[in-house]
Swiss-Prot record:
It comes from Panax ginseng. The gene is atpA. NCBIfam families: atpA, PRK13343.1. Its EC number is 7.1.2.2. This is ATP synthase subunit alpha, chloroplastic. Produces ATP from ADP in the presence of a proton gradient across the membrane. The alpha chain is a regulatory subunit. GO terms for cellular component: chloroplast thylakoid membrane; proton-transporting ATP synthase complex.
C-alpha cells in the first residue's frame, strides 16, 4: 500500500499556487436575438465600433454596421446557417483588413483576399485596412502622364491619364468589359500593376476574362478580385474596397496601378439589400441615403501622388451598366459626377458593326490633352474636329438628294475615319501605330481606297512600317514628338505601301 506523505502533498500544492497566473481577460460579448437573410441582431456588444469585425461561436465573421440603443445590426460574411438564436458573439477589436504583398500578382482572390484559384496560400507579412482614407489635396499632383489603352478612339480623343478616374458606361452587351480588359492587355511592358474587380458577375464571365489574361501573359502584372453573383451581399459590397487596398499597396510604393471595377452598380444593389434588411430608411430607387458616399469614398482613393510621396498613381475605371441608354438613372448620374469623364458605349453603334462602340460625341475626358504625348496631340486634334463635322453632315445628308463635290468628299473622308477607329477585341495598338493610323486617315491617304479595303490596308501598312522604317518608331518613342523626320519617313512608307497595295488588288 502506498504511503501518503503530507510534506510531498503540501509541496505540490505550494508549487501549483506559485505557478498560478492571475490574468484577467475582458471580452466584449453579446447574444444573438435574431438571424436570417445575411443579417444578425445582437443584444450586448456594448463597446463595439462601427465597422468592427465580430465573431460568432461557430466561426462565422460579421461586420457591425448598425449600432442602435438596444441592439447591434451585423451583416454576415458567410451563409451563417449554423448560427442560432441565443448563441454568443464576441467583438474582435479589429476593423476589416487584408494581407497585402507582391505575391498577390497573378492570383485570383475573393473579397477577403483569400485565394480562390486553387494554387495554395499567398504569403504576406503586411496588412492594410480595407477602408482607408483617400489622399488629401497636398498629397496629390495634377495628372500629366498618359495611361495608354491601346484603343485609337480613346487614346486620341478621350485620353486617360495616370491617376484619373474614367467611367465606362453603356447598355449590357456593348463591349464595356472588352474596353477594360484591352486596357489591361495594353499595359504589358509599361510597368503598370492592374487590378480587375468583378462584383456580382457570372462565374463563367470571370473565368473567361482570367483565361484571356493568362493566354496573353497579362496575369503576371494583374490581380483579379472576384465575388460572383451567388456570393453573400456583404462580400459583394466589400470586393471593390479590397481591390482598392491591394492597388494602394503598390501606389504607395511608387508604382503605377490601374483598377477596374466591374461593376459598381452591382455593389450598390448589394448595399441596398443590406441596408433594407437592416431597416435603414430607403431613398430614391430604394437605395439608402448614403449610396453616393459608398462610391465617392471608393473612387476618391484613385490619385496621382505628389513627388514627396513618390509619384505613384492609381487610375480607376469603373464600369456602369445602363438600362436602354438611360444615363439619368440614380447610380449612373452619381458615378458620372464623381469621375473625371466618361466613355459612352452605344448599342446602336455596336449593332452597326462599329466596335469598340464608343460614341465620341458624348464621351469626354476632363483631363484632356494633358494626358497625351506631344506626338499624339499633333495628329489627334484634326481627327476629333473632322469626326464631329462628319456626324453633323451625315445627319443632314439623309434629307438632301444632291450634294456638292466638297460635301461628298467630306462624307467619304468621314466614313474612312470611322473605319480606322474600328479594332478587333484583344488587339490593342501601340501609340506609334495609333499615330501612324490617324495621320494616314486625316491627311487623305485613305480617300483613294474603297471603305472595305481600309482595315486591310492599315494592317499591311503597320507591318510594312515596322519592318522597313523602324526609325519611325524609335523617333516617336524617344522624343515623344511627331518630328519632320518622322513625318517624312511615314509619308514615304504610305506612298510605297499604297503602290504595293493597288498592284496587289489589281492582280
Amino acid at each position: 500500500m502506498v504511503t501518503i506523505r503530507a510534506d510531498e502533498i503540501s509541496n505540490i500544492i505550494r508549487e501549483r499556487i506559485e505557478q498560478y497566473n492571475r490574468e484577467v481577460k475582458i471580452v466584449n460579448t453579446g447574444t444573438v436575438l435574431q438571424v436570417g437573410d445575411g443579417i444578425a441582431r445582437i443584444h450586448g456588444l456594448d463597446e463595439v465600433m462601427a465597422g468592427e469585425l465580430v465573431e460568432f461561436e461557430e466561426g462565422t465573421v460579421g461586420i457591425a454596421l448598425n449600432l442602435e440603443s438596444n441592439n447591434v445590426g451585423v451583416v454576415l460574411m458567410g451563409d451563417g446557417l449554423l448560427i442560432q438564436e441565443g448563441s454568443s458573439v464576441k467583438a474582435t477589436g479589429r476593423i476589416a483588413q487584408i494581407p497585402v504583398s507582391e505575391a498577390y500578382l497573378g492570383r485570383v482572390v475573393n473579397a477577403l483576399a483569400k485565394p480562390i484559384d486553387g494554387r495554395g496560400e499567398i504569403s504576406a507579412s503586411e496588412y492594410r485596412l480595407i477602408e482607408s482614407p483617400a489622399p488629401g489635396i497636398i498629397s496629390r499632383r495634377s495628372v500629366y502622364e498618359p495611361l495608354q489603352t491601346g484603343l485609337i478612339a480613346i487614346d486620341s480623343m478621350i485620353p486617360i491619364g495616370r491617376g484619373q478616374r474614367e467611367l465606362i458606361i453603356g447598355d449590357r452587351q456593348t463591349g464595356k468589359t472588352a474596353v477594360a480588359t484591352d486596357t489591361i492587355l495594353n499595359q504589358q511592358g509599361q510597368n503598370v500593376i492592374c487590378v480587375y474587380v468583378a462584383i456580382g458577375q457570372k462565374a463563367s464571365s470571370v473565368a473567361q476574362v482570367v483565361t484571356t489574361f493568362q493566354e496573353r501573359g497579362a496575369m503576371e502584372y494583374t490581380i483579379v478580385v472576384a465575388e460572383m453573383a451567388d456570393s453573400p451581399a456583404t462580400l459583394q459590397y466589400l470586393a471593390p474596397y479590397t481591390g482598392a487596398a491591394l492597388a494602394e499597396y503598390f501606389m504607395y510604393r511608387e508604382r503605377h496601378t490601374s483598377i477596374i471595377y466591374d461593376d459598381p452598380s452591382k455593389q450598390a444593389q448589394a448595399y441596398r439589400q443590406m441596408s433594407l434588411l437592416l431597416r435603414r430608411p430607403p431613398g430614391r430607387e430604394a437605395y439608402p441615403g448614403d449610396v453616393f458616399y459608398l462610391h465617392s469614398r471608393l473612387l476618391e482613393r484613385a490619385a496621382k501622388l505628389s513627388s514627396r510621396l513618390g509619384e505613384g498613381s492609381m487610375t480607376a475605371l469603373p464600369i456602369v451598366e445602363t438600362q436602354s441608354g438611360d444615363v439619368s438613372a440614380y447610380i449612373p448620374t452619381n458615378v458620372i459626377s464623381i469621375t473625371d469623364g466618361q466613355i459612352f458605349l452605344s448599342a446602336d453603334l455596336f449593332n452597326a458593326g462599329i466596335r469598340p462602340a464608343i460614341n465620341v460625341g458624348i464621351s469626354v475626358s476632363r483631363v484632356g490633352s494633358a494626358a497625351q504625348i506631344k506626338a499624339m496631340k499633333q495628329v489627334a486634334g484634326k481627327l476629333k474636329l473632322e469626326l464631329a463635322q462628319f456626324a453633323e453632315l451625315e445627319a443632314f445628308a439623309q434629307f438632301a438628294s444632291d450634294l456638292d463635290k466638297a460635301t461628298q468628299n467630306q462624307l467619304a473622308r468621314g466614313q474612312r475615319l470611322r473605319e480606322l477607329l474600328k479594332q478587333s477585341q484583344s488587339a490593342p495598338l501601340t501609340v506609334e501605330e495609333q499615330i501612324m493610323t490617324i495621320y494616314t486617315g486625316t491627311n487623305g491617304y485613305l480617300d483613294l481606297l474603297e471603305i472595305g479595303q481600309v482595315r486591310k490596308f492599315l494592317v499591311e501598312l503597320r507591318t510594312y512600317l515596322k519592318t522597313n522604317k523602324p526609325k519611325f518608331q524609335e523617333i516617336i518613342s524617344s522624343t515623344k514628338t511627331f518630328t519632320e523626320e518622322a513625318e517624312a519617313l511615314l509619308k514615304e512608307a504610305i506612298q510605297e505601301q499604297t503602290d504595293r497595295f493597288i498592284l496587289q488588288e489589281q492582280a
